[in-house]
Curated annotation (Swiss-Prot):
This is Kynurenine 3-monooxygenase. Transmembrane segments: none annotated. One of its GO terms (biological process) is anthranilate metabolic process. Signal peptide: none annotated. It is found in: Mitochondrion outer membrane. Its EC number is 1.14.13.9. It catalyses: L-kynurenine + NADPH + O2 + H(+) = 3-hydroxy-L-kynurenine + NADP(+) + H2O. It holds the Pfam family FAD_binding_3. GO terms for molecular function: FAD binding; kynurenine 3-monooxygenase activity. Its cofactor is FAD. Pathway: Cofactor biosynthesis; NAD(+) biosynthesis; quinolinate from L-kynurenine: step 1/3.
Length: 506
C-alpha cells in the first residue's frame, strides 16, 4: 500500500474520462496505475469494444472547463487544433422535387461546440500520460475481480502472444493489485460497477431503446474539400428515424443512421429497399454525397448496434471505489453530452476530494480514508441528480432532432427565447440548449429552469390568445348575421386553443 503521504490510485478504463482522472490524480501527487482491457488505443489495429469506430464525439464548454482544471493547457490546445467547430444544425429536406437546407444556429452569440474524433482524443491523452513519471499504463489487462473492503483488484494479463498458464485449461496469467482507491471509467458494460454491486446496494436501471445505429462516411470532394458545410451538424429528420453527419478534420463526414430495428430488418432485405429508403427519406445523401455502391457496402459491412442508457445510484462504495462516465450514467448520444458529462464527473469528483481534505498533507492514512468516504458520498449526492437529468435530456432530444426541428411551435419558442436572451439579457432567459452546451450549470437545475420558462411562455401565449379571441368574439356577437352562432361552440374553441398553446410551449 502507498504511504500516508501519497495515495495509490488504480483507474480502470483508458478512454478520455479515465485519462483525465489520471491527470487529476497525478497532479495531486498520487501514484496512478491505469488499466485498459484493450491494447494500446493509439495503435490503428486495436479493435474497439463495439468493433467499429464510434459516433463522432461532441466537445462543449463544460467538457473544456473540466480539461482546463487539469492544469495542462497545452493538452487543450493540442486537442483544439484537431477538432472542427460546429455552430448549429443544418436541416435537410425536399419539396416539390427541389432539395433545400435550413440552418439553425446553436447560439445567438455565435458560440460553438466541436466535433472530435475519439481516436485523436485517445492519442493526445495517452501521449501526455506517458510523459508523467507517477503514471503507469497497463494495456491488455482485464479486471476480473475486486475486494473493495481489502482494497485489492485482480486483472488477467492478456498480452499478445502470451501463452496460457500450464495446466490452467487455457487461463491467462492473473495479477493482484493493491490500491487506496479505484476509479471505474470502463464504460457502459463496466466491470468495476459489476464488482462494486457485490458490496454496495446499488439501484440500477438499464434500458435499450428501440433504435439501432449504423455508421457511414461521406468522403471529401475530388479537390479534397468538404462536400457540405463543415460548420454544422447535418440532420435529415424523419418521424421515427434520422440520418446525421458530423465533419472530421480530414474533410470527410462521419454519418449515422438511427432507426428502429424493424426498419433495419426491412433495409437488410435488398439493395433496392435500402436505396429507395434513402432517396425517399434522406434526399441529397445518395448519390450526391455517397455513391449507391458505397452506401450499400457500408450498410452491409458496418455493424447495426443498439443504444443503451443506464442510471444507477450510488456511484461509490465506502472510501475505496467510485464510478464515473458511462460506467455511472451511460446516456443516449442525442445531446452530444456523453463525453462532456464524463469529463465533468472528474472535475466534480476531485473538487469533492479537495474540499473534504483528502489531499491534506498532515492527514494520516485512516483520516484520509474517512475524508475520502465523505468526499465520495458528497460526489454521489451531487452527481446522481445531474446524471439522471442528462440521461432524460438526451432521450428527449432524440424526438426533437428527428421531428421537433421541423415543427413551427419548436421554432417559435426557440425564436422567442433567443430574442429575450439577446435583447433582454438581464432577464436571465436562455434556451435549454444554450444552458446545457455553453455553461457549467447543473443539468438538474437546467431542467427545472426550462420547465418554469415553458410555463411562463404558456401563460403569456394563453393570455394573448384569450385577448384576441375575446375581441373576436365581441365583434362577432355584435354582427346580426353571426349572433346565432352557438356560444358554447365558441367557448369550446377558446378552451381548445388555450390548452393547445399551454401544452405546446410548456
Amino acid at each position: 500500500m502507498a504511504s500516508p503521504a501519497k495515495q495509490k490510485v488504480v483507474i480502470v478504463g483508458a478512454g478520455p474520462v479515465g485519462c483525465l482522472a489520471a491527470l487529476y490524480a497525478a497532479a495531486r501527487g498520487d501514484d496512478v496505475e491505469l488499466y485498459e482491457l484493450r491494447g494500446d488505443l493509439r495503435v490503428p489495429g486495436t479493435i474497439p469494444l463495439n468493433f467499429t469506430k464510434s459516433i463522432n464525439l461532441s466537445l462543449s464548454h463544460r467538457g473544456i472547463t473540466a480539461l482546463r482544471h487539469s492544469g495542462r493547457e497545452h493538452v487543450i490546445n493540442e486537442i483544439l487544433q484537431e477538432v472542427v467547430p460546429i455552430y448549429g444544425r443544418m436541416i435537410h429536406g425536399r419539396d416539390d422535387g427541389k432539395l433545400w437546407e435550413a440552418p439553425q444556429a446553436y447560439d445567438v452569440h455565435g458560440r460553438n461546440n466541436y466535433s472530435a474524433d475519439r481516436g485523436m482524443l485517445n492519442n493526445v491523452f495517452l501521449n501526455e500520460l506517458e510523459r508523467i513519471p507517477n503514471i503507469k499504463l497497463f494495456f491488455n489487462h482485464k479486471l476480473t475481480g475486486a475486494d473493495f473492503q481489502a482494497n485489492k483488484a485482480w486483472f488477467e494479463r492478456r498480452l499478445p502472444g502470451e501463452a496460457p498458464l500450464p495446466g490452467s485449461s487455457g487461463r491467462v496469467p492473473e495479477i493482484e493489485v493493491d490500491f487506496d482507491f479505484l476509479i471505474g471509467a470502463d464504460g457502459a458494460h463496466s466491470a468495476t460497477r459489476y464488482h462494486m454491486m457485490k458490496f454496495a446496494r446499488v439501484d440500477y436501471q438499464q434500458e435499450y431503446i428501440d433504435t439501432l445505429w449504423c455508421e457511414f462516411r461521406i468522403p471529401p470532394s475530388p479537390t479534397n474539400d468538404f462536400l457540405i458545410s463543415p460548420s454544422h451538424l447535418h440532420i435529415w429528420p424523419g418521424k421515427e428515424f434520422m440520418f446525421i453527419a458530423l465533419p472530421s478534420v480530414d474533410k470527410s463526414f462521419t454519418c449515422t443512421l438511427f432507426a428502429p430495428a424493424s426498419h433495419y430488418a426491412q433495409l437488410e432485405r435488398s439493395t433496392e429497399d435500402l436505396l429507395q429508403f434513402f432517396d425517399e427519406h434522406f434526399p441529397g445523401v445518395c448519390p450526391q454525397l455517397i455513391s449507391p455502391s458505397d452506401l450499400t457496402a457500408q450498410f452491409r459491412a458496418n455493424p447495426h448496434l443498439p443504444l443503451i442508457s443506464i442510471k444507477c445510484a450510488p456511484h461509490h462504495y465506502s472510501s475505496s471505489v467510485v464510478i464515473v462516465g458511462d460506467a455511472a450514467h451511460a446516456v443516449l448520444p442525442f445531446y452530444g453530452q456523453g463525453l462532456n458529462a464524463g469529463l465533468e464527473d472528474i472535475q466534480v469528483l476531485f473538487d469533492a476530494l479537495d474540499k473534504h481534505g483528502v489531499y491534506n498533507a498532515n492527514s494520516d492514512q485512516a483520516a484520509r480514508a474517512l475524508a475520502r468516504q465523505s468526499a465520495f458520498a458528497a460526489y454521489t449526492a451531487s452527481r446522481t441528480a445531474d446524471a439522471h437529468a442528462i440521461n432524460d435530456l438526451s432521450r428527449q432530444n432524440y424526438v426533437e432532432m428527428r421531428w421537433g426541428v421541423k415543427q413551427p411551435l419548436y421554432r417559435l419558442r426557440k425564436y422567442i427565447e433567443e430574442a429575450l436572451y439577446h435583447y433582454l439579457p438581464s432577464l436571465g432567459w436562455q434556451t435549454q440548449y444554450t444552458r446545457v452546451s455553453f455553461s457549467n450549470q447543473r443539468y438538474s437545475e437546467i431542467i427545472a429552469i426550462n420547465r418554469r420558462q415553458g410555463r411562463i411562455l404558456g401563460a403569456v401565449f394563453g393570455s394573448t390568445l384569450i385577448s384576441v379571441l375575446a375581441v373576436t368574439g365581441i365583434y362577432l356577437w355584435r354582427q346580426p348575421t353571426t349572433r346565432l352562432l352557438s356560444l358554447a361552440s365558441f367557448r369550446g374553441a377558446l378552451q381548445g386553443a388555450l390548452q393547445g398553446a399551454l401544452t405546446g410551449t410548456a
